[in-house]
Amino acid sequence: MAVTNVAELNELVARVKKAQREYANFTQEQVDKIFRAAALAAADARIPLAKMAVEESGMGIVEDKVIKNHFASEYIYNAYKDEKTCGILSEDDTFGTITIAEPIGLICGIVPTTNPTSTAIFKALISLKTRNGIIFSPHPRAKNATNKAADIVLQAAIAAGAPKDIIGWIDQPTVELSNQLMHHPDINLILATGGPGMVKAAYSSGKPAIGVGAGNTPVVVDETADIKRVVASILMSKTFDSGVICASEQSVIVVDAIYDAVRERFASHGGYLLQGK
């Protein structure tokens, strides 16, 4: 059923909550099987998802979004495939403590237009690995790409044994529905990736939230730097996926002793220099 209003959203939350309660009882072996299948499916779809993201959002570069999708699927799988996320993690006889891995419950996943597929893949996979359910609120300008990525992960997870409603999404996202999802009493955690307003809303929701928003990443270049390498690295990073990644360099601070040399190097590589006010 498509989710286009508050009533339909509430029904979706109920379904995903029910699925998560079932999933919370899965063993580590079952979870790892689902995690692997979902990651492989996302990796296999990295190229068509990248094309879909660029076409729908009008932002970024297909080849670079392929890399991001690959990173969000294969790298994340390899990084966490051996991580224990079920049952007893450790016991300390000295202090009489036992550390147990438990799912947090239902997660609200806010996805931006700049990374509509890779962010959805990443959040869906880590939710599956930790036995949580997740509902995505995609950006309106990239909703189809985001929801397609979520559906690919979901279908692979179901085929591997996951409950059928363990991942959900809003089909026609609006600010109202996004806020409704964040403030829903059954949501236990918010993973918010987006602009400053969205991240602030997540932190102001009264729920535990992890937010990632626009940054102002500076680069400091001093006399010890390899100027050729520094300039090439900054330009490569800043132009990756048309510079839409919030962690890419936003400003360069250069000490006086090498300022002219760095400036000339940027200019020789096609960099634009603003002068005056």
Set out the residue ranges of the language-model regions:
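N-terminal Rossmann-like NAD(P)+-binding subdomain of aldehyde/semialdehyde dehydrogenases
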Residues: 1-98, 126
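ALDH superfamily catalytic-core signature
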Residues: 3, 199-277
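Predominant activation on well-ordered alpha-helical scaffold segments within soluble catalytic domains
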Residues: 10, 17, 36, 50, ...
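Short, flexible active-site loop motifs that bind/organize anionic cofactors or intermediates
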Residues: 21, 39, 168-171, 220, ...
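Aldehyde/semialdehyde dehydrogenase
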Residues: 25-43, 47, 51-52, 176-189, ...
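Short secondary-structure boundary/hinge segments and terminal tails
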Residues: 71-72, 145, 220, 252
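Rossmann-like NAD(P) dinucleotide-binding subdomain of oxidoreductase/dehydrogenase enzymes
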Residues: 88-229
